[in-house]
Structures are given as structure tokens and as C-alpha cells.
Curated annotation (Swiss-Prot):
Residue sites binding (6S)-5-formyl-5,6,7,8-tetrahydrofolate per the record: 23, 81, 120, 444
One Pfam family matching this protein: MnmE_helical
Protein name as annotated: tRNA modification GTPase MnmE
Family: Belongs to the TRAFAC class TrmE-Era-EngA-EngB-Septin-like GTPase superfamily. TrmE GTPase family.
Organism: Solibacter usitatus (strain Ellin6076)
Gene: mnmE
């Protein structure tokens, strides 16, 4: 399904830069670019030095033109990339000349949409392109790159193939029903259905960890005044973001910032010290501290090892419940007491124990090693929801194998096939595709 129109867009971020790129894709890409660059050989997949011209034929810039001949291009169409100096004026001029020559401005994500529609990539790979662009940590980029190479698609394909084989078996059983030949007894159906169901369930369940890669964690740092919450906040961020003083109540409101812990984006919340107070502004800050515990995935309850554990400390730990990680700060000081059971000793001042704290944060949300070594999990909420839908129909089919005719069983199996196909884009509605690709940047 090659695009009938030729599209153009700037493919590099806005603003001044050393270089910039304009992309042109479609049946007339080569002819359109020929209108505003000097003559080149147009050898496919080779870089050609040329000059970008204005309407009067004056040189605007010296550029590199690369022609990718269909179908061996990103979009599977004729594609031309013009690399020039990254002046916004020069880039806009190249786009304007392409528009004058018959191209139209590309919509967000339209280059990747064409790659999908033309069979160059499937939908999970297209979505992974967006995730790679949006990656804020190297770990996110690594997982997205694996998905661009097909890690999700490779796990979906055998499930679909096994399901289609079972459907074909049942369809054949219906064809031979008049001859009293049973080609698909219940035991055989269950033998074939069980691995499909179990594989789909495992893949859906992998979102529990894969979702962390994409969505990240929220983590509240809470405790009494002057236990070192802001110092720990700064230490985890590896920058001085929060104000640190010896005056109790310095932090009056929740301060948030994002850090990378083990490659996972973690939204950190530094909160007001929790204590009894009649001061109105501080009281509001303390209320927000309590709310931060409720809203966060984890709560670091910070204790001061130079002071005894109090009822307020115990109350905070109880309030955080299973989400609590107890941090015993100031372990470097001579006055530090014994570390409470289950607490992680750290020094926010020197960094002692902070690597162990980072590991404990990751271990609290995923089994040790899962995030480091697992690469086949899904990171898309859309994929997880569709897999859960498929699981529902597969479970219905398994429960009814021995009690309903094959025709009825097939209804559930076909119903399970639809969401699986929707993941890969085989049967995805246009409005869903538009919603997905509208989240891409223009030029990609």
C-alpha cells in the first residue's frame, strides 16, 4: 500500500544545530528534490554532494542528498534524505521548496505509519520506534531497540500460529462431522489449547515488569524533620536540587524530580518532615507528605541513627505498609546507634550504602535479576490489555471444551485471535492507528 502522495518534513529537532535533515517520501520524491538541488547521479543508497538552491537558482547551502530506492527504504517507498547545516531558515526553505514542487507536509508519525502500511515493519516495531525516541535512560533505549528488532513480535508469532492450527483442526472436524470421524477429541483440543493459553498469560504477566521500563516508578521520601530526607533526595538525584539546612521544617512542600535507578525512571518526592505543629503552612506540607505515601509505588521511610526510633517513625512505617523501605541514615556518624532490623544503613552525606539502597529499590518491585536479564517482556499497556482480552476467551474455550459443539468453541477461539492480531496490526482499526501514530514526532 504505497502512499499516493509524496510527503516532506524536517526530521531533526527544532532549533540551531550543526546539522539538520529533511525527509521526502513517496512516488515523486526524487523528482521533487531534483527541482531545488543541483544535478546528482541519483545512485541509490549512496551519499551525493549537492547544493540547495532558492527559487532564483542561488546557492543556499551545501548539502548531502541520499536516495533510498523502494522497497529498501525506511518507508518502503522512494525516500530522499537531505542533510544540511542545522539552520532553521535553511531547513524551512528546503521544506518550502518541496511543497512548491508538489509534496505535502507529513503528519506526525506518517513516515513510520507508511513503513507499517507498506509491510516494512509490524505495529509493535513501529511503537518501539516511538519508545526509542522517547527513551530517557539507556536501559529504556536498549529494550526499545530490541523491540524494534522484533522481540515482542517473535513472542506473539508462535502463539498466533498455534492458535490458527487449533482453529484449522476444529474447522476440519466440522467438515468431517457427517462421516462420524472425530479428528479433534477433547483431549487433543486441550493438548493444543493449553500452551497457547499459558504462553499468552505469561506474556501478559510480563507487563508487571515491562511496564516499569516504560512508565517508571514513583517514590516518596518521608520521615521526621532533619532525618536527612532532602540530603538523600539530592544523593539519589546526584545533584543539589533540594535545600538542605539544620533548621527543622526547611522543606514545606513536596519537591519532585526524576532520577534513573538501574535504568528505570524514578520520580522522587522529597516531602516535608512529619511532626506535630500548629504552623499552618507547615501543616499543609505535612498533609501532602501523607498523600505522597498514598500516591507512590514505594516510600523510603528515613530514620536518624543518631536518635532513638519514635512512635512517629513506627506510625510512618505502618502507614506505608508493604510499600515501605526503611532507610537508616547517618550511619557514618560516631553517634550512630544500632541499625534496626530490615533497615538499610546509608549516609546521605558520604554516599555510603546508597548503591545497596538503589538495589533494594529495584528488588522491591521485581525479583532480583529480572529487569537486568529479561528482554522479552512487553512494555506497552495496549499490548497488555489486548493479551488479557485474548486470555479471557482462551479460558472460556478451555472450560467448555467437553461441553459445547466445535462451532461454539470456534467462536471463542476466533474472539481470542482478534486481539492478538490487533497487537501486530493485522486487524487494527484506522482510528486506533491514527491515535498511535499521532504520538510520534513529525519527521518520523
Amino acid at each position: 500500500m504505497l502512499g499516493a502522495e509524496t510527503i516532506v518534513a524536517i526530521a531533526t529537532p527544532p532549533g540551531r544545530a550543526g546539522i539538520g535533515m529533511v525527509r521526502v517520501s513517496g512516488p515523486d520524491a526524487r523528482a521533487i528534490v531534483s527541482r531545488f538541488v543541483t544535478s546528482i547521479a541519483w545512485q541509490p543508497w549512496q551519499a551525493h554532494l549537492a547544493k540547495l538552491l532558492d527559487q532564483q537558482g542561488h546557492e543556499i547551502d551545501q548539502v548531502i542528498v541520499t536516495f533510498f530506492e523502494r522497497p529498501r527504504s525506511y518507508t518502503a517507498e522512494d525516500l530522499v534524505e537531505i542533510t544540511c547545516h542545522g539552520s532553521p531558515v535553511v531547513l524551512r526553505h528546503a521544506v518550502e521548496r518541496a511543497l512548491e514542487a508538489g509534496a505535502r507536509l507529513a503528519r506526525p508519525g506518517e513516515f513510520t505509519l507508511r513503513a507499517f502500511l507498506n509491510g516494512r515493519i509490524d505495529l509493535p516495531r513501529a511503537e518501539a520506534v516511538r519508545d526509542l525516541i522517547d527513551a530517557t535512560t539507556l536501559y529504556q533505549a536498549r529494550i526499545a531497540a530490541q523491540q524494534v528488532e522484533g522481540s515482542v513480535s517473535r513472542r506473539i508469532a508462535p502463539l498466533k500460529e498455534q492458535l490458527l492450527e487449533l482453529i484449522a483442526l476444529l474447522e476440519a472436524g466440522i467438515d468431517f462431522a457427517e462421516d462420524d470421524i472425530s479428528v479433534a477429541p477433547p483431549a487433543e483440543i486441550l493438548r493444543r489449547l493449553s500452551p497457547v493459553l499459558e504462553g499468552t498469560e505469561r506474556l501478559a504477566a510480563s507487563f508487571q515488569y515491562g511496564g516499569l521500563v516504560h512508565q517508571g516508578l514513583t517514590l516518596a521520601i518521608v520521615g521526621r524533620p532533619n532525618v536527612g530526607k532532602s540530603s538523600l533526595f539530592n544523593r539519589l538525584l546526584e545533584q543539589d536540587r533540594a535545600i538542605v539546612t539544620e533548621i527543622p521544617g526547611t522543606t514545606r512542600d513536596v519537591v519532585s524530580e526524576t532520577a534513573a535507578i538501574g535504568g528505570i525512571p524514578v520520580k522522587l518526592y522529597d516531602t516535608a518532615g512529619i511532626r506535630e505543629t500548629e504552623e499552618r503552612v507547615e501543616s499543609l506540607g505535612i498533609e501532602r507528605s501523607y498523600q505522597a505515601i498514598v500516591d507512590s509505588d514505594l516510600a523510603l521511610v528515613v530514620l536518624d541513627l543518631t536518635r532513638p526510633v519514635t512512635a512517629e517513625d513506627a506510625s510512618l512505617i505502618a502507614r506505608a505498609g508493604a510499600r515501605a523501605l526503611i532507610v537508616a541514615n547517618k550511619c557514618d556518624l560516631p553517634a550512630a546507634g544500632d541499625v534496626p532490623a530490615e533497615a538499610i544503613p546509608v549516609s546521605a552525606l558520604t554516599g555510603q550504602g546508597v548503591p545497596e539502597l538503589r538495589s533494594a529499590i529495584l528488588d522491591a518491585v521485581a525479583p532480583k535479576g529480572v529487569l537486568e536479564h529479561e528482554t522479552g517482556f512487553i512494555t506497552s499497556l495496549r499490548h497488555e490489555q489486548l493479551l488479557r482480552e485474548a486470555v479471557e476467551y482462551l479460558q472460556k474455550a478451555r472450560e467448555a471444551v467437553a461441553s459445547i459443539p466445535h462451532e461454539m468453541l470456534l467462536l471463542d477461539l476466533y474472539a481470542a485471535l482478534r486481539p492478538i492480531d490487533a497487537i501486530t496490526g493485522a486487524t487494527t482499526a484506522d482510528d486506533i492507528l491514527n491515535r498511535i501514530f499521532s504520538t510520534f514526532c513529525i519527521g518520523k
